[in-house]
Amino acid sequence: MARAANPAPRLLGAAMLLLLLVAAGRRAAGAPVVNELRCQCLQTVQGIHLKNMQSVKVTPPGPHCGQTEVIATLKTGQEVCLNPAAPMVKKIIDKMLNQASSN
């Protein structure tokens, strides 16, 4: 009579592999997540009416993007990228800086 192969070594190997995968997954879950590794603004507009804007966020150049990005959030919740070189956008940024320095 032929003897059946002992499944214990295979089962033990599979269990060890599963433990390693779970441990690696938990470690990766605690790692910080980078939002974007590229520029967010692919197209820009020259300006937008101030009464439609809720807030403005200016992101300086960095490792993620080599250009300054100006992102306006409208009252509707939509985000619009503004051209930082446009005269109207420069006025908006100056106004923001003046308000921040006066506070």
UniProtKB/Swiss-Prot annotation:
GO terms for molecular function: chemokine activity; growth factor activity. SMART domains: SCY (SM00199). InterPro entries: Chemokine_b/g/d, Chemokine_CXC, Chemokine_CXC_CS, Chemokine_IL8-like_dom, CXC_Chemokine_domain, Interleukin_8-like_sf. GO terms for cellular component: extracellular space. The lineage of its organism: Eukaryota, Metazoa, Chordata, Craniata, Vertebrata. GO terms for biological process: immune response; inflammatory response. The keyword DNA damage does not apply. It is found in: Secreted. It comes from Ovis aries (Sheep). Pfam families: IL8. Keywords: Cytokine, Disulfide bond, Growth factor, Inflammatory response, Secreted, Signal. It comes from the Eukaryota. Transmembrane segments: none annotated. Disulfide bonds join C39-C65, C41-C81. The gene is CXCL1. Has chemotactic activity for neutrophils. Belongs to the intercrine alpha (chemokine CxC) family. SUPFAM superfamilies: Interleukin 8-like chemokines. This is Growth-regulated alpha protein. Residues 1-30 form the signal peptide.
